């Protein structure tokens, strides 16, 4: 009886390793558009969360991320921006700065202002296409906070798949529900931004390693 149980456990373990290997292989095969980008700058393009609202100077996630990738990261966060307002400054803040990777973080203010998800999605799609046309990689952040804004997660994930962009999941998960990690109802504090930077780094690092800029 004990022997049979041990054999069964070994089989289950082997199947688990096999499924994990398949999953990792699938991730490794996913191609990102402009993986060979000749751009020079990593740019974080977003709203008050990218700006670092609620934290002290130097605690914003682009600054923390810069230390992780050992390269400059340009912070192009503007307090209160919606995805539509972002389009108006896309050229001067992003496209004219020789981007090689742009991390896009919008949607929170669209949600708060009750802008239809279809409009936010259309704006995000335009942002993606313009950045990719400039020869840069694009990473879209999942700004859904645990159970709210799940429609944004689904829509942004769809856009990433359609345009071969990097999807950064669960940016705020466990942060806005934890008083020790947030400065108010909508913004992290320094510790919260550190977690966000770590999540972004984990998502983009495999693609950075394939590009000569950060080798």
Predicted feature descriptions by range:
Residues 1-26, 129:
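Short, basic, low-complexity termini and linkers enriched in Ser/Thr/Gly/Pro
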Residues 2-5, 36, 64-68, 88-215:
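Alpha-helical cap/lid subdomain in secreted, periplasmic
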Residues 12, 19-22, 35, 42, ...:
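Compositionally biased, low-complexity repeat tracts
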Residues 22-24, 52, 58, 83, ...:
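Residues at secondary-structure transition points
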Residues 23, 74, 139:
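Conserved Rossmann-like nucleotide-binding pocket used by diverse enzymes
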Residues 27-85, 89-98:
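Serine-esterase "nucleophile elbow" of acetyl-processing enzymes
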């Amino acid at each position: 009886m004990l022997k049979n149980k041990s054999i069964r456990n070994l089989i289950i373990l082997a199947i688990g390793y096999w499924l994990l290997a398949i999953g990792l292989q699938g991730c490794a095969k996913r191609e990102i558009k402009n993986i060979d980008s000749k751009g020079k700058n990593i740019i974080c393009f977003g709203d008050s969360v990218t700006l670092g609202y609620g934290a002290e100077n130097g605690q914003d996630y682009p600054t923390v991320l810069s230390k992780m990738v050992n390269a400059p990261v340009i912070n192009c966060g503007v307090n209160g921006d919606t995805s539509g307002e972002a389009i108006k400054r896309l050229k001067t803040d992003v496209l004219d700065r020789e981007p090689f990777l742009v991390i896009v973080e919008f949607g929170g203010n669209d949600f708060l202002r009750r802008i239809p998800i279809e409009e936010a999605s259309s704006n995000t799609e335009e942002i993606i296409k313009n950045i990719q046309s400039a020869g840069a990689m694009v990473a879209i952040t999942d700004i859904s906070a645990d159970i709210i804004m799940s429609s944004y997660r689904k829509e942004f994930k769809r856009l990433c798949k359609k345009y071969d962009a990097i999807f950064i999941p669960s940016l705020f998960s466990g942060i806005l529900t934890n008083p020790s990690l947030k400065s108010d109802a909508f913004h992290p504090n320094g510790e919260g931004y550190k977690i966000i930077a770590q999540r972004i780094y984990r998502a983009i690092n495999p693609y950075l390693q394939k590009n000569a800029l950060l080798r």
